[in-house]
């Protein structure tokens, strides 16, 4: 997927991926192939995307988490090594193509030691196909603009975050 490669290259060039961070991926493989979200799904597309992200992870040190679909309440598949019991709650579900989505399913099948958590708060994410990842991005969510607007036929939205500005009119900010 040329557009995915271009997107990831552009994000690497702008230092979007940081070593030690978790980046959330939401993806509708149905949308990537031009169908309505949640209707078709493609393990082949999921494999392509997962493998491209795995390369980025090895190059940058970022870890990826994978959001499931609404049928599993947008639960997140992560490596167990990233699990923090103080901020995350493990749930008993295994993503499936028809309940979780193809990419979360593929990730669960190919990660070293995957678990699924109900919620996560991460500093950044990539939403391929309008899967609504914002619920898992740290406050304050900030859009990131790139030249790549779609992966396949799916609209791409990228987000990072910044600390909240609090304190009112007398507060000073960096």
Curated annotation (Swiss-Prot):
Pfam families: DUF436 (PF04260). InterPro entries: Antibiotic_NAT-like, DUF436. It comes from the Bacteria. Belongs to the UPF0340 family. NCBIfam families: TIGR01440 family protein. This is UPF0340 protein SAR2202.
């Amino acid at each position: 997927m040329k557009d995915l490669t271009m997107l990831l290259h552009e994000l690497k060039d702008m230092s979007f991926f940081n070593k030690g961070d978790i980046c959330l991926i939401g993806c509708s493989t149905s949308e990537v192939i031009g169908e309505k979200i949640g209707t078709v799904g493609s393990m082949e597309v999921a494999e392509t995307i997962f493998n491209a992200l795995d390369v980025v992870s090895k190059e940058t040190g970022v870890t990826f988490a994978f959001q499931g679909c609404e049928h599993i309440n947008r639960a997140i598949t992560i490596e167990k090594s990233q699990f923090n019991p103080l901020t995350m709650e493990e749930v008993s579900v295994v993503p499936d193509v028809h309940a979780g989505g193809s990419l979360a399913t593929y990730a669960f099948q190919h990660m070293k030691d995957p678990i699924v958590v109900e919620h996560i708060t991460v500093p950044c994410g990539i939403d391929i196909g309008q899967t609504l990842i914002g619920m898992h991005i740290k406050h304050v969510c900030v859009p990131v603009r790139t030249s790549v607007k779609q992966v396949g036929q799916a609209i791409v939205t990228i987000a990072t975050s910044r600390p909240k500005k609090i304190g009112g009119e007398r507060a000073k900010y960096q």
